[in-house]
Amino acid sequence: MPPKPSAKGAKKAAKTVVAKPKDGKKRRHARKESYSVYIYRVLKQVHPDTGVSSKAMSIMNSFVNDVFERIASEASRLAHYNKRSTISSREIQTAVRLILPGELAKHAVSEGTKAVTKYTSSK
């Protein structure tokens, strides 16, 4: 029997489980979305020789979802205050400044600005 290929860092985004309903046809379960692939990529950029457990990955995924939720709700509130029906990059930037502390907010704003500039120039 050949040895199993090393899946040291290969995290699956989601499992597709097949269940048989009453009508006899196979039905796939919905895929669970997560940021695990992207968290893993960042981890490998910062610490190439470090792994992460599934429990730690679940915690990181919850953390990312929580931060995005906070930014989105703050941006929504800002748009509502200013009688705007659209959340623009300006609302997101202000929300990030309000939510994240000090130096972290500065770095997040500069990285966000860089990403938006890169996106608009590639269009």
UniProtKB/Swiss-Prot annotation:
PTM comment: Monoubiquitination of Lys-118 gives a specific tag for epigenetic transcriptional activation and is also prerequisite for histone H3 'Lys-4' and 'Lys-79' methylation.
Compartment annotation: Nucleus; Chromosome
CC terms in the record's Gene Ontology section: nucleosome; nucleus
GO biological processes: innate immune response
Residue ranges, annotated region (Disordered): 1-30
InterPro entries, alphabetized: Histone-fold, Histone_H2A/H2B/H3, Histone_H2B, HISTONE_H2B_site
GO molecular function: DNA binding; protein heterodimerization activity; protein-containing complex binding; structural constituent of chromatin
Keyword annotations from UniProtKB, A to Z: Chromosome, DNA-binding, Glycoprotein, Isopeptide bond, Nucleosome core, Nucleus, Ubl conjugation
Gene3D superfamilies for this protein: Histone, subunit A
Cross-link (Glycyl lysine isopeptide (Lys-Gly) (interchain with G-Cter in ubiquitin)): 118
Domain of life: Eukaryota
Glycosylation sites: 110
Pfam families the record matches: Histone
Main location group: nucleus
Function according to Swiss-Prot or TrEMBL: Core component of nucleosome. Nucleosomes wrap and compact DNA into chromatin, limiting DNA accessibility to the cellular machineries which require DNA as a template. Histones thereby play a central role in transcription regulation, DNA repair, DNA replication and chromosomal stability. DNA accessibility is regulated via a complex set of post-translational modifications of histones, also called histone code, and nucleosome remodeling.
Similarity annotation: Belongs to the histone H2B family.
Subunit structure: The nucleosome is a histone octamer containing two molecules each of H2A, H2B, H3 and H4 assembled in one H3-H4 heterotetramer and two H2A-H2B heterodimers. The octamer wraps approximately 147 bp of DNA.
UniProt name for this protein: Probable histone H2B 4
Species per Swiss-Prot/TrEMBL record: Caenorhabditis elegans
Gene coding for it: his-48
